[in-house]
């Protein structure tokens, strides 16, 4: 959009005076943020309405992206950038004497997700708007998100993340005209109506009111605005008597209170199922109502609507869609099923069997009795169809939806849709060959790969503005709208002046992070050290513990020889553990106690520092990632579906230290063997161990003095205050046979770390590697990923 500095200043002052009754000089940063965000909303609104009217008039096919998580972080700067007015606003603030950074930092991160799943969903919203496709998000308006992490005495403590603050979410708009009701619980019996149709009769069900809040998603440089719809829950006035107690009302409020409520109890499992169904049913109801306004037959809805299931949380969608089409709109089974399969598509995000969602059949039947009936019918018809094709009975049993008193949600998504995709080449291969091989034998045409991507605007233009400015000097600003122009940087990979400038920019980013570390933890770190970073969800398969084992080895090396020749190293962690995940919490405690041990030991001469930055989130990632020298991507080969932090680090010039897992393989293909450091077993070697059952971690431990010394450190009193946690980790590695092969990969990892040390000593070579990573990161833009989804799965047009 076009905006002069003078008009912006006038608009901003008017809104500040109108909303806050205050002058600029007297306003707090929060008041200034609220006024600025309201000003931006004023600019967005006509564009938003224009987009809505355009879609209604043109009746374009629209994709709806259902995800339990969306993790956009702060939205102010992204919205300003995408509108093309970021520089204008900064200039206006400078004239007003306002610090833009202070105002920007007054915004809370939108706490609607946890990790990569939510960040990917948010990136896709940005890319859909930027590429011009009609695509809307559908999720939950969590009041407290996952949790805010505090580290107390080394332990993770979870507190509510009250990200709404006292003023709410300035970006959202409540849409009362799209409110719908969602029924749960009760009994359902089937009866013939006056037309002879079998219809359900509900008794003793509970009714929830689903209230939509829309958040605009602005395209970069095109004034295009799509929509992220978030659902909140209310008790309908006409059903107030169904919720007579405070406890009953609280249980309703819990549905949209937090992401991933603890499911270790029956009540927790029930709440999760209700949460997932609530979001899915509400979204599908409004999609159908919107489609019917076009005056087209409902049986042809797939021609104008695509519903995408992001992981298994919304995988009840095919069954709920069938319920709506048949029970609410009188479609026959055949027409409803045809429309459902052609409308639905599904992204799988894991090969870990425990992460493929399953529900106890009795619990499911109790919460969603009619949907349960429909799932049984889908399952029975599937079994009959496959038997009619003379399939192996064992294959049929392996792939059915209802078995062993469980409902397999991934199976429902595959059978009830026309597409299933993995999120990296290796991941998709593993789905075909292993996790879902029986399904692949039945439906090979449904399987495809869509490697994940990231938003370059967030991670370069916003998070690393100094690097962006250096790139502008070299190749112009064309890359900002066409990321593939980054490849032009390769022309400068042997230019010493350019390499020196890139190295300087990285050092400046490290200095900014070092200041934050000192301020937030009290630990002083040197920017001359290698900043070695692992920031991601804490999970055993991601192997933060392997990183810690190496740190302990370095500690003992330095205790044995304080004069050891090594480049100083700062290991930086950021991670949240799921509240009920005891092992992950123990790893966090160990990292923090090792940090205390190392950072206070003056005999190490500052050569080794360990920092755990609490409450890892998008806005913190924007500070950490540009400052990283080394990107730790060390999951056990075959366990990480894709990863996206690896791409963000790559784009800002970190060198990837990685196993051949997920998208690391594709990063290696882009940068070449000389610009990445690979170690450890590949997936074939891991699978050979599984097949032969020949891995014996105690044997590795007992036969290797270095490993024994490191592992014993957990239980011999060297690390204070970890008696229970140290024993738990020791048991996991030795007694329980080291499930993720840390000890098997340990020596290869140590050698890779030594290679990092050697490479970093040659600053020019390191800067060249960094430049090559930046230049080839264009491969991983989510704009291209969305183009593939739109053309190959959703069949959309711009």
Task: Cite the ranges covered by each PLM segment.
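A conserved ligand/cofactor-binding region detector
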Residues: 1-798
């Amino acid at each position: 959009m076009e905006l002069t500095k003078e008009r912006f200043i006038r608009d901003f002052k008017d809104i500040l005076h109108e909303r806050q009754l205050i002058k600029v000089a007297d306003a707090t940063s929060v008041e200034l943020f609220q006024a600025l965000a309201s000003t931006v909303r004023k600019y967005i609104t006509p564009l938003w309405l224009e987009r809505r009217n355009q879609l209604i008039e043109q009746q374009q096919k629209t994709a709806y992206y259902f995800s339990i998580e969306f993790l956009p972080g702060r939205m102010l700067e992204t919205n300003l950038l995408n509108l093309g007015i970021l520089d204008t606003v900064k200039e206006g603030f400078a004239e007003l004497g306002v610090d833009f950074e202070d105002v920007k930092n007054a915004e809370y991160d939108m706490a609607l997700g946890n990790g990569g799943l939510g960040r990917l969903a948010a990136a896709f919203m940005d890319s859909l708007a930027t590429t011009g496709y009609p695509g809307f998000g559908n999720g939950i308006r969590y009041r407290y998100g996952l949790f805010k992490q505090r580290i107390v005495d080394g332990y993770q403590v979870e507190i509510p993340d009250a990200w709404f603050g006292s003023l709410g979410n300035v970006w959202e708009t409540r849409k009362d005209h799209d409110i719908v009701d969602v029924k749960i619980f009760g009994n359902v019996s089937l009866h013939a109506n006056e037309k002879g149709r079998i219809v359900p009769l509900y008794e003793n069900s509970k009714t929830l009111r689903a209230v939509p809040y829309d958040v605009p998603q602005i395209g970069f440089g095109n004034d295009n605005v799509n929509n992220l719809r978030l659902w909140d829950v209310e008790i309908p006035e006409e059903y107030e008597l169904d919720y007579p107690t405070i406890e009953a009302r609280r249980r309703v409020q819990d549905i949209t209170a937090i992401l991933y409520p603890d499911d270790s109890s029956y009540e927790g499992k029930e709440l999760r199922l209700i949460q997932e169904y609530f979001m899915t049913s509400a979204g599908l109801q409004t999609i159908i109502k919107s489609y019917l306004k076009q005056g087209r037959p409902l049986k042809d809805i797939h021609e104008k609507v695509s519903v995408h299931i992001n992981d298994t949380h919304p995988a009840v969608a095919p069954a709920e869609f069938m319920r709506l089409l048949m029970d609410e709109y009188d479609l026959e089974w055949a027409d409803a099923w045809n429309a459902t399969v052609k409308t639905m598509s599904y992204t799988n995000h894991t090969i870990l069997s425990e992460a493929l969602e399953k529900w106890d059949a009795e619990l499911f039947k109790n919460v969603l009795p009619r949907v349960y009936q429909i799932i049984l019918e889908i399952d029975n018809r599937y079994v009959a169809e496959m038997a009619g094709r003379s399939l192996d009975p064992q294959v049929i049993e392996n792939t059915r939806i209802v078995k062993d008193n469980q409902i397999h949600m991934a199976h429902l998504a595959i059978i009830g849709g026309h597409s299933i995709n993995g999120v990296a080449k290796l991941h998709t291969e593993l789905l075909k060959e292993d996790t879902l091989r029986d399904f692949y034998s039945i439906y090979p045409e449904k399987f495809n790969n869509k490697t994940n991507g990231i938003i370059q605007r967030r991670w370069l233009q916003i998070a690393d503005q100094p690097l962006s400015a250096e790139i502008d000097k070299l190749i112009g600003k064309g890359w900002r709208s066409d990321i593939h122009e980054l490849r032009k940087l390769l022309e400068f990979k042997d230019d010493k002046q350019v390499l020196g400038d890139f190295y300087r920019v990285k050092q400046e980013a490290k200095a900014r992070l070092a200041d934050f570390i000192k301020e937030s933890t009290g630990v002083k770190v040197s920017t001359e050290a290698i900043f070695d970073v692992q920031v991601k969800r804490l999970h055993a398969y991601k192997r933060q513990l392997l990183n810690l084992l190496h740190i302990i080895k370095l500690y003992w090396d330095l205790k044995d020889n304080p004069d050891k020749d090594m480049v100083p190293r700062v290991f930086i962690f950021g991670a949240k553990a799921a509240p009920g995940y005891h092992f992950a919490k123990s790893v966090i405690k160990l990292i923090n106690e090792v940090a205390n041990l190392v950072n206070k030991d003056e005999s190490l001469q500052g050569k080794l520092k360990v920092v755990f930055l609490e409450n890892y989130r998008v806005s913190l990632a924007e500070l950490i990632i540009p400052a990283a020298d080394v990107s730790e991507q060390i999951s056990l080969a075959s366990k990480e579906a894709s990863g996206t932090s690896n791409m963000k680090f790559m784009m800002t010039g970190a060198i990837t230290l990685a196993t051949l897992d997920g998208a690391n393989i594709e990063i290696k293909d882009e940068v070449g063997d000389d610009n990445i450091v690979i170690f450890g077993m590949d997936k074939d070697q891991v699978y050979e161990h599984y097949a032969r059952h020949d891995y014996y971690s105690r044997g590795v431990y007992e036969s290797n003095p270095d490993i024994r010394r490191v592992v014993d450190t957990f239980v011999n009193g060297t690390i204070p205050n970890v008696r229970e946690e140290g024993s738990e980790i020791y048991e996991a590695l030795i007694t329980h046979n080291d499930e993720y092969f840390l000890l098997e990969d340990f020596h290869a990892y140590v050698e890779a770390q030594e290679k990092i040390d050697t490479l970093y000593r040659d600053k020019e070579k390191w800067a060249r590697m960094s430049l090559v990573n930046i230049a080839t990161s264009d491969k991983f833009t989510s704009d291209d990923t969305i183009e593939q989804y739109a053309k190959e799965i959703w069949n959309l047009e711009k």
